[in-house]
Amino acid sequence: MAKKLFIETHGCQMNEYDSSRMADLLGEHQALEVTENAAEADVILLNTCSIREKAQEKVFSKLGMWRELKQQNPDLVIGVGGCVASQEGAAIRERAPYVDVVFGPQTLHRLPEMIDAARSTRKPQVDVSFPEIEKFDRLPEPRVDGPTAFVSVMEGCSKYCSFCVVPYTRGEEVSRPFDDVIAEVIHLAENGVREVTLLGQNVNGFRGLTHDGRLADFAELLRVVAAVDGIERIRYTTSHPLEFSDALIQAHAEVPELVKFIHLPVQSGSDRVLAAMKRNHTVLEYKSRIRKLKAAVPDICISSDFIVGFPGETEKDFEQTMKLVEDVGFDFSFSFIYSARPGTPAADLADDLPEEVKKQRLQILQSRIHQQGYEISRRMVGSTQRILVTDFSKKDPGMLQGRTENNRIVNFRCDNPRLIGQFAQVHIDDALPHSLRGTLIDSTLH
């Protein structure tokens, strides 16, 4: 009987990508088959996130649930990876001594040998080092599962925002070689992928070495990815305003494969708070980027990240954030109440804003952005949208599901599985709070 691998992933799309590569790696080197049931697994891996305090506590809660499985099966290997592993290292075993393997985001390629060593020596294996981009050289070609795929193009971040742990858990920015990224995209396209999402903590800071020794920027990478036969849509995340260049904006105007959606985190609409966050740009500079982008692509939709209740945030600071929300017209956000992360400069700042005030501000922010997003969705009713069909609807097996260019989920009546992976013209009939509903007009089956 084949041995089983269970992976649970917390956090960002980079972690989702890393988890898929772990499955590829262990499938090739140890013939492990992925299971959705931790109780039947021979190897359990938890890919962690340390951005939020609650996410970190969630790690040890989950490990506690698996302790009984380890007691029942001493041969079970439990591994912890991702950013909590990178941050805590061997200290994870102080709270969870039954963990066998601890690895960081940059050492996941060493998993086969670490698992083997844990089994043969019965001793814990810990490696949370930063061997730059070596992991990509030792990973197999990615397996394709559907018409969309993630492609990591760079790792780490060198911006050192005062609130953020990423530079400490994933290291400084390192870009993959340009040709390696293109080769991975070609492989995906040849196996049916039609939409790629390029990933990086600061993805538009990509500077990849080409075969002729040049450094190619992100705008050039986008143009070459768009030229790959079979790739019809390109998304990317996450961007930093400092790296959102005129060349990148021009690419949005000229490359039709780039979707009409961008995620550009701003965190706050107050210059005073942005300075304390060490974001190294002003609100005016951010709005200037947005104005140029909207001039290049008038119907583009924009989402962002916000932190509410950063130490020292006043009512005036929050009002300035809400003004930015109105001025830009964000239609979606990842927004959170500030939580201090150990080891970051902001953790030393006095955080004396009452929790109730923080919660109230977050509710106001999220409510307004949700309203703006819903207004955009309502304006789409009556239009015809080109949808990339990705799967059956999660709520109704008689419906298919896809996504618009501006990142709306669309459900429509159709039970033909051959349409999955294809593009379809769908008339939008109704706007729901979190999705659209439509009617299939036309599709192109290959």
From Swiss-Prot:
Compartments where found: Cytoplasm
Domain MTTase N-terminal, chain residue ranges per copy: 3-120
Positions of [4Fe-4S] cluster 2 binding: C157, C161, C164
GO MF annotation list: 4 iron, 4 sulfur cluster binding; metal ion binding; N6-isopentenyladenosine methylthiotransferase activity
Keyword Transmembrane helix annotated: no
Residues the entry annotates as binding [4Fe-4S] cluster 1: C12, C49, C83
Keyword set, alphabetical order: 4Fe-4S, Cytoplasm, Iron, Iron-sulfur, Metal-binding, S-adenosyl-L-methionine, Transferase, tRNA processing
Classification via SUPFAM superfamilies: Radical SAM enzymes
Keyword Lyase set for record: no
Required co-factors: [4Fe-4S] cluster
One of the record's GO cellular component terms: cytosol
Broad EC category: transferase
Cited Pfam families: Radical_SAM, TRAM, UPF0004
Domain named TRAM: residues: 378-442
Major place of residence: cytoplasm
Reaction equations catalysed: N(6)-dimethylallyladenosine(37) in tRNA + (sulfur carrier)-SH + AH2 + 2 S-adenosyl-L-methionine = 2-methylsulfanyl-N(6)-dimethylallyladenosine(37) in tRNA + (sulfur carrier)-H + 5'-deoxyadenosine + L-methionine + A + S-adenosyl-L-homocysteine + 2 H(+)
Domain Radical SAM core per the UniProt entry, residue ranges: 143-375
InterPro entries linked: Elp3/MiaA/NifB-like_rSAM (IPR006638), Methylthiotransferase (IPR005839), Methylthiotransferase_CS (IPR020612), Methylthiotransferase_N (IPR013848), Methylthiotransferase_N_sf (IPR038135), MiaB_methiolase (IPR006463), rSAM (IPR007197), rSAM_horseshoe (IPR023404)
EC number: 2.8.4.3
Function description: Catalyzes the methylthiolation of N6-(dimethylallyl)adenosine (i(6)A), leading to the formation of 2-methylthio-N6-(dimethylallyl)adenosine (ms(2)i(6)A) at position 37 in tRNAs that read codons beginning with uridine.
Subunit structure: Monomer.
PANTHER family, alphabetized: CDK5 REGULATORY SUBUNIT-ASSOCIATED PROTEIN 1, MITOCHONDRIAL TRNA METHYLTHIOTRANSFERASE CDK5RAP1
Family named by the database record: Belongs to the methylthiotransferase family. MiaB subfamily.
Name assigned to this protein: tRNA-2-methylthio-N(6)-dimethylallyladenosine synthase
Species annotation: Pseudomonas aeruginosa (strain ATCC 15692 / DSM 22644 / CIP 104116 / JCM 14847 / LMG 12228 / 1C / PRS 101 / PAO1)
Gene it is expressed from: miaB
